[in-house]
C-alpha cells in the first residue's frame, strides 16, 4: 500500500527510477556502452553453455557448474538491463509497484543462487585436488543436478520474504528511487514506517548466504593449498591452473557485492551516484568477465572456441 504525505491512502502504485543521480544528461550516451556490455555478456555466456553442451568431453561437474553460472549470469543481467536502457534511452522512468518487487526478488535471489554455485565449484575443486580418487563417486551427475536444484531453492527461499516485508510497508515520503532498478535496500528506505525487520533480515541473509559461502570457499582453498604444497612442482602448476578461473570468478562476484552492500548500508547520501555505479558493476561485470576468464584460462573451452571461429571463418569464405 502507498499513502500520501498526509497519511491518506494514495492511488499511486508505482516508483520512479531516475537512473544515475547527477548524471541524467549523460545517461543517453552511457546506455550505448552498457548495452554493448550486456550483449557481450549474453553472447559470451550462451557460447559457454553451447560449448559445454555439445562437447561430450566437457560433461564433467566443473563444466556443468560453469553452465549453471552462465545461465544465472544471463538471467541476472537481463533482470535489470532492459529497464535500465528504457530509462536511459526513452525516459521510461516509472515501474509498477509489483513489477518493482518482482525485479527486486529476481536480482537478489539470482545473486544468492550464483553464490551457491560458486561454493559448489569450490567444493568440486577441493574434491578433485584433495581426494582425486573419490571425485567421480562423490560428484556424480545426479548429485550435481541436486546441487543445482538446491542452489535455486536456497536463493529463492532466502529472498522470498524481502518483497513480502516491503509489501507490508506504507510509503508516504516519496516514490522516487535514485537508482536504475529496484533493490531491497533502496525501496525500504522510502517507507514511512519502522523498517527494522527489513534491515535485520537483510543482514541475516547477507551473513547466512554470502558471508557463509565466502568463508566456506576460503576454507576450501586453504585445504587445497595445504594439499598442493605437498605435490611436485609440475603437479602444483597443474592444480593451480585448474583453480585460477574459479578464483577469478569468486573475486569478480564477491568484491563488487560486498562493496555495494557496504555502501548501501552505511552511505548517508541518497543522491550519490556511487551506489548506483557499483550496482551496475555488480550486475554487469561478472556476466561479462566470467566467460572471458574461463575462455582464456580453461584450455578445453579455449580450444573449442577457437575451433568454432575456425569453422565460421571457413564457412564464410567463397
Curated annotation (Swiss-Prot):
Disulphide-bridged cysteine pairs: 100-182
An example molecular function term from Gene Ontology annotations: olfactory receptor activity
Range of residues in the leader sequence: none
Keywords: Cell membrane, Disulfide bond, G-protein coupled receptor, Glycoprotein, Membrane, Olfaction, Receptor, Sensory transduction, Transducer, Transmembrane, Transmembrane helix
Expression tissues: Highly expressed in prostate. Very low levels may be detected in some other tissues, such as placenta, skeletal muscle, heart, ovary and testis. Up-regulated in prostate cancers.
Glycan attachment positions: 8, 91
Residue ranges, Extracellular side: 1-31, 82-100, 167-198, 261-275
Pfam family, one: 7tm_4
InterPro entries: GPCR_Rhodpsn, GPCR_Rhodpsn_7TM, Olfact_rcpt, OR51/52/56-like
Topological region Cytoplasmic: 53-60, 124-145, 220-239, 297-318
Cellular compartments annotated: Cell membrane
Main location: membrane
The keyword GTP-binding is annotated on this UniProt entry: no
GO annotations of cellular component type: plasma membrane
Membrane topology: Multi-pass membrane protein
Function as written in the Swiss-Prot or TrEMBL entry: Odorant receptor.
Family in the record: Belongs to the G-protein coupled receptor 1 family.
Name used for this protein in its record: Olfactory receptor 51E1
Record lineage: Eukaryota, Metazoa, Chordata, Craniata, Vertebrata
Gene that encodes it: OR51E1
